From Swiss-Prot:
This is Transcription factor lin-26. Residues 101-110 are annotated as: PEST. Expressed in somatic gonads and germline precursors until the 50-cell stage. After the 100-cell stage, expression is seen in differentiating hypodermal and support cells (at protein level). A zinc finger (C2H2-type) spans 353-381. Disruption phenotype: RNAi-mediated knockdown results in embryonic lethality. This is rescued by RNAi-mediated knockdown of rsd-6, and nrde-2. RNAi-mediated knockdown at the larval L1 stage causes a weak but significant decrease in expression of lin-39. Knockdown in mothers caused lower levels of lin-39 expression in the P blastomere of embryos. Knockdown in L1 stage larvae, in a lin-39 mutant background, causes abnormal fusion of vulval precursor cells at larval stage L2. It comes from Caenorhabditis elegans. GO terms for molecular function: DNA-binding transcription factor activity; RNA polymerase II transcription regulatory region sequence-specific DNA binding; zinc ion binding.
Length: 490
């Protein structure tokens, strides 16, 4: 019998010492510990020599006594790594490895019986040199390995020992988890799996946040595009508030050409009917405020040296820079008309009108195309709002109603127009109350006030008075001619 569980090397003179203790000790655990300790003490081996002997093995042939069978049972049931029962020493795998054949597999912890090819020896052990076998002792009784196996099979074994043996020999997960190394590996695997789950959760959260950011960006881009289409960018004044100083505008000729059309203050191009109705209610001289008529053509003011449309297109197509437009105060407008040359740009009057109720200033040009800024102030002081939300009672201008609908998740496709004739009449009254200077400037065709100069001229020359009186009489007749033109628009 080969006891690989001890991992010790011995010679033939040590075997009687070992078997002498087999019949003294009745405790199996004490027997194993005492055999190993006494064996090491008797040989007086150093640590280095003992480490070299760990790769050797012990070969013992035992009898079928009770103590021997108990020792074999203990070795089998308590999990020694390398333990086997062979019929002869020649059948040991180490001899096959020594002869140069393939390396043997490590024997399992079971008692296997093989056919008896040769008669077994009574006591055989491996010396330091395997090529010199040791003769057996003749005093010991010979016992075959078959009897040992039969005694092991017929001997009553406690249920606990059988369960331990099955747990040791079976390849189930519980057996693998019984060792600390397996538990540590399992713990590492669980930790890695937990980390992977956490990483997956974080990745999903990042993807969700990125999708939310993209959705918000797209929503803002769409809102900006819609606001641009409704003319919300025109809420802010495009001109400098310092109306008393001469400034240079960066607007191109195309901006000036499209400037009279941008008068809806967020109402969109589809609100021509509202603009025409307000034109009908107001005096015809206010028509240029809605971008419908030209004030200079109406009142016969001095024509401005503007370039024709064909020449303007040619200059734009050739890539030449368009002429800059100078903005002058009202008092300097007439002087600039007489003194400027052909190469100068278009000159416009830039004046600021303050609300008579709240004092809010509003800057406009000579064409009156920014009248929507005045309308914004009028809407503040008026209780009548032109548009209403489809889903609630919120009222206001079109841009405010659409913004409210988007914030409240209401129908934001278009605002509900609730304009009536009473509202238009009230807005007309509010215009005269808030901006009387604007009304007077429109009535005189954006000409500067020359009341004192006219009085002096009346005293000096009566002919000039007659001419001025004829001009004053022509103004209402010309306005009456414009009324049929404004009525079809309604």
């Amino acid at each position: 019998m080969i006891l690989h569980g001890f991992h010790l090397s011995t010679s033939s003179h040590c075997l009687p010492f070992i078997f002498r203790h087999l019949f003294i000790f009745h405790s199996i655990t004490a027997l194993c510990d005492h055999v190993i300790s006494n064996y090491c003490n008797s040989l007086k081996l150093s640590n280095n020599k003992f480490n070299q002997m760990l790769s050797k093995f012990v070969v013992v042939e035992v009898s079928n006594s009770n103590n021997t069978m108990t020792l074999v049972e203990y070795l089998v049931t308590h999990g020694f790594d390398k333990f086997a029962v062979v019929t002869d020493l020649v059948d040991h795998p180490s001899f096959k490895y020594k002869d140069g054949s393939s390396s043997p597999e490590s024997p399992s912890t079971t008692a296997s019986t093989a056919a008896q090819h040769t008669p077994p020896r009574t006591a055989v052990s491996t010396p330091t040199s395997i090529n010199t076998p040791v003769p057996p002792h003749q005093n010991k009784q010979r016992h075959s390995i078959d009897k040992i196996a039969a005694n092991l099979s017929t001997k009553k074994v406690s249920p606990s020992s059988i369960e331990k043996q099955l747990q040791r020999t079976s390849h189930n997960p519980l057996h693998q988890l019984s060792t600390p190394h397996a538990l540590s590996q399992l713990q590492k695997l669980l930790e890695e799996q937990h980390k992977i789950n956490q990483m997956n959760i974080q990745k999903k959260e990042q993807e969700r946040q990125q999708a939310e950011i993209q959705r918000i960006l797209l929503q803002q881009a769409n809102a900006a595009q819609i606001n641009h289409s409704f003319g919300l960018e025109r809420l802010t004044p495009e001109y400098d508030d310092n109306h008393h100083s001469e400034t240079i505008s960066k607007a191109s000729s195309e901006d000036l050409k499209t400037e009279p059309d941008s008068t809806d203050f967020g109402l969109g191009t589809s609100d021509d009917q509202v603009r025409a109705s307000m034109l009908h209610l107001l005096h015809p001289v206010f028509a240029p405020a809605f971008g419908m008529l030209d004030a200079e053509n109406i009142f016969g003011a001095a024509s401005k040296p503007t370039t024709p449309a064909s020449k303007r297109r040619n200059t734009d197509s050739n890539g030449a820079p368009s002429k800059k437009h100078r903005w002058l105060p009202v008092n300097e407008l007439e002087e600039s008309r007489s003194s400027r040359g052909k190469n100068c740009g278009r000159v416009h009057c830039k004046a600021t009108y303050k609300c008579a109720l709240c004092g809010k200033p509003t800057t406009l040009n000579s064409t009156g195309s920014r009248w929507n800024l005045l309308r914004h102030v009028i809407m503040i002081h008026s209780d009548c709002k032109p548009y209403k939300c489809w889903d609630c009672d919120f009222t206001g201008i079109k841009s405010n109603v659409i913004s409210h609908a988007r914030q409240c998740r209401h129908n934001a496709e278009d605002a509900h127009d609730i304009t009536t004739d009473e509202m238009r009449a009230e807005w007309n009254l509010r215009l005269h109350e808030c901006f009387p200077d604007y009304v007077r400037a429109k009535e005189r065709g954006w000409q500067p006030e020359e009341v004192t100069v006219k009085k002096e001229e009346v005293e000096e020359s009566p002919t000039l008075v007659k001419q001025e009186l004829t001009l004053v009489k022509q103004e209402p007749t010309f306005a009456e001619q414009l009324e049929p033109m404004a009525q079809p628009l309604v």
